[in-house]
Amino acid sequence: MAASKVKQDMPPPGGYGPIDYKRNLPRRGLSGYSMLAIGIGTLIYGHWSIMKWNRERRRLQIEDFEARIALLPLLQAETDRRTLQMLRENLEEEAIIMKDVPDWKVGESVFHTTRWVPPLIGELYGLRTTEEALHASHGFMWYT
């Protein structure tokens, strides 16, 4: 048996073309100094805008406080009027309830003073529904 000849692969005539073996790195972008400058500029702009907004917010808050101070006497007068009306209604109800009790003085103060004592919520809402008393004592806290 004759051994077969092995054919070895060889380059093409004239050789292979040049191989590009250099690293192909993309462009690096901004330098470190420019990125630092942009960052510091952004921080300064943010600080300035927050400072500007805080001044505006403080101005609006002062305006709200001044409006509240201007309206406070009106609101206090309405509250006093409502309180006195409720006290009058309570006195009328007390007169109806206690009409058969001898020596009962309608509207006699439980405090031994002639000074005005603001009534407690229990005094004002003692003859009213529980819902009214809860609304007066807790207000709008139900909705939060």
UniProtKB/Swiss-Prot annotation:
Tissue: Widely expressed, with highest expression in heart, skeletal muscle, liver, kidney and placenta. In intestinal mucosa, down-regulated in areas involved in Crohn disease and ulcerative colitis.
Residues modified as N-acetylalanine: 2
Stretch list, region Important for inducing cell death: 102-144
Sequence intervals crossing the membrane: 30-51
Keywords of the record: Acetylation, Apoptosis, Disease variant, Electron transport, Host-virus interaction, Membrane, Mitochondrion, Mitochondrion inner membrane, Nucleus, Primary mitochondrial disease, Respiratory chain, Transmembrane, Transmembrane helix, Transport
Membrane topology: Single-pass membrane protein
Domain of life, source organism: Eukaryota
GO terms assigned for molecular function: ATP binding; endopeptidase activator activity
Any single Pfam family the record assigns to this protein: GRIM-19
BP terms from Gene Ontology: aerobic respiration; cellular response to interferon-beta; cellular response to retinoic acid; extrinsic apoptotic signaling pathway; mitochondrial respiratory chain complex I assembly; negative regulation of DNA-templated transcription; positive regulation of execution phase of apoptosis; positive regulation of protein catabolic process
Cystine connections: none
Induction context: By IFNB1/IFN-beta combined with all-trans-retinoic acid (ATRA).
The keyword Glycoprotein is assigned to this record: no
One GO CC term, this protein: mitochondrion
Medical condition linked: Hurthle cell thyroid carcinoma: A rare type of thyroid cancer accounting for only about 3-10% of all differentiated thyroid cancers. These neoplasms are considered a variant of follicular carcinoma of the thyroid and are referred to as follicular carcinoma, oxyphilic type. Mitochondrial complex I deficiency, nuclear type 28: A form of mitochondrial complex I deficiency, the most common biochemical signature of mitochondrial disorders, a group of highly heterogeneous conditions characterized by defective oxidative phosphorylation, which collectively affects 1 in 5-10000 live births. Clinical disorders have variable severity, ranging from lethal neonatal disease to adult-onset neurodegenerative disorders.
Function noted in UniProt: Accessory subunit of the mitochondrial membrane respiratory chain NADH dehydrogenase (Complex I), that is believed not to be involved in catalysis. Complex I functions in the transfer of electrons from NADH to the respiratory chain. The immediate electron acceptor for the enzyme is believed to be ubiquinone. Involved in the interferon/all-trans-retinoic acid (IFN/RA) induced cell death. This apoptotic activity is inhibited by interaction with viral IRF1. Prevents the transactivation of STAT3 target genes.
Protein family according to the UniProt entry: Belongs to the complex I NDUFA13 subunit family.
Protein name: NADH dehydrogenase [ubiquinone] 1 alpha subcomplex subunit 13
Organism: Homo sapiens
